[in-house]
UniProtKB/Swiss-Prot annotation:
Keywords: ATP-binding, Cell membrane, Membrane, Nucleotide-binding, Translocase, Transport. It is found in: Cell membrane. Part of the ABC transporter complex PotABCD involved in spermidine/putrescine import. Responsible for energy coupling to the transport system. ATP binds at residues 40-47. GO terms for molecular function: ABC-type polyamine transporter activity; ATP binding; ATP hydrolysis activity. PANTHER family: SPERMIDINE/PUTRESCINE IMPORT ATP-BINDING PROTEIN POTA (PTHR42781), SPERMIDINE_PUTRESCINE IMPORT ATP-BINDING PROTEIN POTA (PTHR42781:SF4). It is an enzyme of class 7 (translocase). It comes from Streptococcus pyogenes serotype M3 (strain ATCC BAA-595 / MGAS315). The lineage of its organism: Bacteria, Bacillati, Bacillota, Bacilli, Lactobacillales. It is a peripheral membrane protein. The keyword NAD does not apply. This is Spermidine/putrescine import ATP-binding protein PotA. It catalyses: ATP + H2O + polyamine-[polyamine-binding protein]Side 1 = ADP + phosphate + polyamineSide 2 + [polyamine-binding protein]Side 1. The keyword Transmembrane helix does not apply.
Length: 384
């Protein structure tokens, strides 16, 4: 890892008036030029971390570093960090130009330089020609672009974004995800994004921190977080999951529903109680006699791209299946899956223990060398 641009070292926060501890020994290093997301439900502590970075809140204990310099006592205006707030915090009585130029005017930058940089920045956020437009006459998406332009015009080392997409409708929110990600990559500025939306975090981030009750439960790439959740909370919080109690018979062999199945997980004690995760999209519907499990369809909903089917096995376990095929309520179907579709979770495993075990024991698929090569490989395997 290169020298971190931001470091949190054992940072905790307790509100003195209520005695509530909202952050518990937070530790992380952020690299320059990456897109990071703090993901968690309301009250998980994610916005508190953002406010401590910005200097809006003081940490109760621990150290915060910006580019190697301890900044716990550094005033907000001395930190090379800019924040985009949820409500955008724009000046309603000013034009787009005046809002974006505000920070440059405070620094007494030359007027010609201000005009040049405002024009360049508005072009970056697709608001070229909006300089004289009143803020009050802009749409929600346009206001958000103004807030982002104001945050990046000084080319800060870090931009903090506190749920800036939450007020937008679904279509515009999706468009802005692409725009934000592309803008961050083009500028090379470190973005720290706060959201409760799992899909948003997975789609935009280089690295995700999953938070719960003031702690970082798991951190990793979006693919790692989704495919290898550390515990029940993460598996449930990130996407949809079928979570079944099981027993790890030995390395790469797990038992649940009274049957034994091959897996790609290891590094656990023989006959250790575990939880088994199978994502709904990884379950294939087949004939009852051909399935590894048999379930009875209870209900289904059409979700546009797939049917969401709820079924129950003979032990009463609920199964969610995503399928492009429509089922019939009351019919018995078979469920098939591969060893790679099973993810085994130990009970009460720390992130350090989890990472070490995954690296040593879990058999990971080799990365695909593009879609075309992957399709050709599949066809070659079918022809063997």
């Amino acid at each position: 890892m290169t020298k971190p641009i931001i470091t949190f070292n054992n940072v905790s926060k307790t509100f003195e008036d209520s005695g509530t501890q909202v952050l518990k020994n937070i530790n992380f290093d952020l690299e320059e030029g990456k897109f990071y997301t703090l993901l968690g439900a309301s009250g998980s502590g994610k916005s508190t971390i953002l406010n401590i970075m910005a200097g809006l809140l003081d940490a109760s204990s621990g150290d915060i570093y910006l580019d190697g310099e301890r900044i716990n006592d550094l005033p907000i205006n001395k930190r090379d960090i800019h924040t985009v707030f949820q409500n955008y915090a724009l000046f309603p009585h000013m034009t787009v130009f005046e809002n974006v130029a505000f920070a440059l005017k405070l620094k007494k930058v030359d007027k010609k330089e201000i005009a040049k940089r405002v024009k360049e920045t508005l072009k970056m956020v697709q608001l070229e020609g909006y300089e004289n437009r009143s803020i009050q006459k802009l749409s929600g998406g346009q206001r958000q672009r103004v807030a982002i332009a104001r945050a990046i015009i000084n080319q800060p080392r870090v931009v903090l974004l506190d749920e800036p997409l939450s007020a937008l409708d679904l279509k515009l929110r999706t468009e802005m995800q692409y725009e934000l990600r592309e803008l961050q990559q083009r500028l090379g500025i470190t973005f720290v994004f706060v959201t409760h939306d799992q899909e948003e975090a997975l789609a935009m981030s280089d690295w995700v921190f999953v938070m719960n009750e003031g702690e970082i439960v798991q951190s990793g790439t979006p693919v790692d977080i989704y495919d290898e959740p550390i515990n029940h909370f993460v598996a449930n919080f990130i996407g949809e999951s079928n979570i079944i109690n099981g027993t790890m018979i030995e390395d790469y062999l797990v038992s649940f529903n009274g049957k034994e199945f091959e897996s790609v997980d290891g590094g656990m004690r023989p006959n250790e109680p575990v939880e088994v995760v199978i994502r709904p999209e990884d379950l294939q519907i087949t004939l009852p006699e051909e399935g590894k499990l048999q379930v009875k369809v209870d209900t289904q909903l059409f979700r546009g791209v797939h049917y969401e089917i709820i079924a129950y096995d003979e032990l009463g376990n609920e199964w969610m299946i995503h399928s492009t095929r429509k089922a019939i309520e009351g019919e018995v179907i078979g469920l098939d899956f591969t060893p790679e579709d099973l993810h085994i979770m130990r009970l009460n495993e720390t992130e350090e223990e989890f990472d070490a075990r995954i690296e040593e024991y879990v058999e990971m698929d080799e990365p695909e060398d593009g879609l075309i090569n992957a399709i050709e490989e599949e066809r070659n395997e079918e022809n063997l």
